[in-house]
């Protein structure tokens, strides 16, 4: 009579292996839930990239055969479409309220891939969009009797000149550092070209000279550009000072590479926008409520 009771007791007792298995499954589910929530939070915190440059292919330059590029020839174009057409209602992109995404079409005039047509997808505020057309509009404005008015105000005057004098050593140091950095990259790229892509005679003649004269060349270039940037930033108005002070290197390395015929050695590329006068007409037709826009200039 006692044997069935013992059997029943053994059946009712939980197995230690089953308990450990349940704990493992519960822990796995908890970790999976935490990772899923963490992944969702991480997605919501991601910010949309400020800009992306898409290089146009040869088929995209000509409008005569728009249907040729199909299948695998459109990865970069699809990347740009996904970049612009991504749903902004989700919380994945943190788009500022006063910003919008526009497409600026231009040509690389200096640097790598010179002459290449590019589409620049960039986020710009309303103020930045207006500043794109400001140089054209300001050049059309003429002062009465052809005289330039020298006015005094909060944004222009002797106090601005005093400020530029104070910033003179700071601008010199910053320009020296930036010019040294870009100059070193340019020198290294030129050295690689003559060492790996040119003939044996270039390797034994140019490369030793580049190595020997590097300290003299880099110090002379950085010091000259630093002194030039410090003098040029002296101004009467805040706007002119900021335009001159923020351009530390003055595009010298890109200009030097273009003169030497070594555009690929430039540490950066300069893109010239096409038909910038169309920006103002494009902006006038936009709905201010719309957050994401595309304008071709």
From Swiss-Prot:
InterPro entries: TMEM169. It is found in: Membrane. Residues 61-85 have a biased composition (Acidic residues). Residues 181-210 are cytoplasmic. Disulfide bonds: none annotated. It is a multi-pass membrane protein. Pfam families: TMEM169 (PF15052). Residues 1-159, 232-297 are extracellular. This is Transmembrane protein 169. It comes from Homo sapiens. The lineage of its organism: Eukaryota, Metazoa, Chordata, Craniata, Vertebrata. The gene is TMEM169.
């Amino acid at each position: 009579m006692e044997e069935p009771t013992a059997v029943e007791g053994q059946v009712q007792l939980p197995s230690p292996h089953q308990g450990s298995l349940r704990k493992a499954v519960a822990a796995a589910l908890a970790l999976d839930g935490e990772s899923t929530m963490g992944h969702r939070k991480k997605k919501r915190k991601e910010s949309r990239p400020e800009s992306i440059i898409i290089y146009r292919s040869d088929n995209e330059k000509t409008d005569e055969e728009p249907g040729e590029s199909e299948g695998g020839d459109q990865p970069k174009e699809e990347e740009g479409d996904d970049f612009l057409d991504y749903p902004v209602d989700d919380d994945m992109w943190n788009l500022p309220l006063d910003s919008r995404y526009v497409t600026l079409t231009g040509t690389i005039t200096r640097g790598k891939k010179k002459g290449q047509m590019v589409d620049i997808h960039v986020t710009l505020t309303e103020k930045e969009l207006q500043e794109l057309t400001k140089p054209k509009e300001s050049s059309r404005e003429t002062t009465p009797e052809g005289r330039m008015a020298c006015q005094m105000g909060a944004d222009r005057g002797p106090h601005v000149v005093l400020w530029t004098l104070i910033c003179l050593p700071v601008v010199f140091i910053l320009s020296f550092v930036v010019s040294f950095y870009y100059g070193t990259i340019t020198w290294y790229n030129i050295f690689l070209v003559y060492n790996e892509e040119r003939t044996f005679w270039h390797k034994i003649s140019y490369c030793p000279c580049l190595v020997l004269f590097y300290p003299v060349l880099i110090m002379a270039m950085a010091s000259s550009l630093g002194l030039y940037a410090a003098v040029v930033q002296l101004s009467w108005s805040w706007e002119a000072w900021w335009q001159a002070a923020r351009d530390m290197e003055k595009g010298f390395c890109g200009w030097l590479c273009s003169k030497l015929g070594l555009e690929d050695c430039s540490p950066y590329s300069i893109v010239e926008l096409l038909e910038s006068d169309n920006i103002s007409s494009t902006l006038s037709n936009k709905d201010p409520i719309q957050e994401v826009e595309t304008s071709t200039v």
